[in-house]
From Swiss-Prot:
Keywords: Glycoprotein, Glycosyltransferase, Golgi apparatus, Lipid metabolism, Membrane, Signal-anchor, Transferase, Transmembrane, Transmembrane helix. Pathway: Protein modification; protein glycosylation. GO terms for cellular component: Golgi cisterna membrane. It is a single-pass type II membrane protein. It is found in: Golgi apparatus, Golgi stack membrane. It is an enzyme of class 2 (transferase). This is Galactoside alpha-(1,2)-fucosyltransferase 1. Its main location: Golgi. Disulfide bonds: none annotated. Residues 1-8 are cytoplasmic.
Length: 366
């Protein structure tokens, strides 16, 4: 029989070993939960059901701070998987992205974008939402919801854990409470911002040759809207009288502004915008295949004149400053007003100038 002191030493040693093993197991368990691993990692014979979400991001999605994961880490309180159909052009997809982000946060869900939206927005902005793998998208039991273009009470209490949104939402009523986060998501990549600022630095006032202090971005939407607005929506696009009045509004309030004009109809702009004061610069390239060049230029201006469309909305929203927009651009009985609410489309502090609807009256005459 061992002396009593030896027995105590052995018991103490065994107790330390047991406590160390328990502590090690608890540490591994807690660390695995913190990093998103479940009991299936510790016990391979257990097959737990996990949400069908992507585990990778496409190249170009920035990494979150203080993490080695290529995808941003979602807060542990979020669950489920939400995404949105990428539809339409550049401005449409910006609206879809911002609305998805805002509604997912409001409902405590994780937001993912589809590869097509990533391909449109990631080359321009430092977006952070992860990308849903196509194979995961195809096997997820989605519920689908088409959104109208303004925030509604029912959108704050959507119970579906796997929801695919659709539509063309671009209303500030969805996301304005997250304005700084939205502006951060739509931060330009450095080379695009620097290129746009380089263009602005080279501009000079025509009469004096001085460097302007105030830049007003002007976006003139034309293209397919020339047919779509009058023929489908009983509406008009901006004419030269609107642009002249909008520019005069800024001239009356800002010292020596310069107007930086971009459009998908630059030829019309050069022929119809009054340049006699020497403060109008035609800087846009009008290339619809590469809209980010004009967009970057507009966002680096101090203020905005927009006409109609989501491209102009987002340029104004990100630029900040004063915004003048084309108001009342459809007839009162237009079907467009069933899907578009002006009070939900334009921020309350923005200034509207009424459109000239007389061309529509001419069309209506027998």
């Amino acid at each position: 029989m061992w002396p009593l002191s030896h027995r105590h030493l052995c018991l103490a040693f065994l107790l330390v070993c047991v406590l160390s093993a328990i502590s090690f197991f608890l540490h591994i368990h807690q660390d695995s939960i913190r990093h998103g691993l479940g009991l299936s990692v510790l016990c391979p014979d257990r097959h737990l059901v996990t949400p069908p979400v992507a585990i990778f991001c496409l190249p170009g999605t920035p990494m979150s701070p203080n993490t080695s994961s290529p995808c941003p880490q979602h807060p542990a309180s979020l669950s489920g998987t939400w995404t949105i159909y990428p539809d339409g052009r550049f401005g449409n997809q910006m609206g879809q992205y911002a609305t998805l982000l805002a509604l997912a946060q409001l409902n405590g869900r994780r937001a993912f974008i589809l590869p097509a939206m990533h391909a449109t927005l990631a080359p321009v902005f430092r977006i952070t939402l992860p990308v849903l793998a196509p194979e995961v998208d195809s096997r997820t039991p989605w519920q689908e919801l088409r959104l109208h273009d303004w925030m509604s009470e029912e959108y704050a209490d959507l119970g579906d854990p796997f929801l695919k949104l659709s539509g063309f939402p671009c209303s500030w009523t969805f996301f304005h409470h997250l304005r700084e986060q939205i502006r951060s998501e739509f931060t330009l990549h450095d080379h695009l911002r620097e290129e746009a600022q380089s263009v602005l630095r080279r501009l000079r006032l025509g009469r004096s040759g001085d460097r302007p202090r105030t830049f007003v971005g002007v976006h003139v939407r034309r293209g397919d809207y020339l047919q779509v607005m009058p023929q489908r929506w009983k509406g008009v696009v901006a004419n030269s009288a609107y642009l002249r009045e909008a520019m005069d509004w800024f001239r009356a309030r800002h010292e020596a502004p310069v107007f930086v004009v971009t459009s998908n109809g630059m030829e019309w702009c050069r022929e119809n915008i009054d340049t006699s004061k020497g403060d109008v610069m035609f800087a846009g390239d009008g290339q619809e295949a590469s809209p980010w060049k004009d967009f970057a230029l507009l966002t680096q201006c101090n203020h905005t004149i927009m006409t109609i469309g989501t491209f102009g909305f987002w340029a104004a929203y990100l630029a900040g400053g004063d915004t003048v927009y084309l108001a009342n651009f459809t007839l009162p009985d237009s079907e467009f007003l069933k899907i578009f609410k002006p009070e939900a489309a334009f921020l309350p502090e923005w200034v509207g100038i009424n459109a000239d609807l007389s061309p529509l009256w001419t069309l209506a005459e027998p």
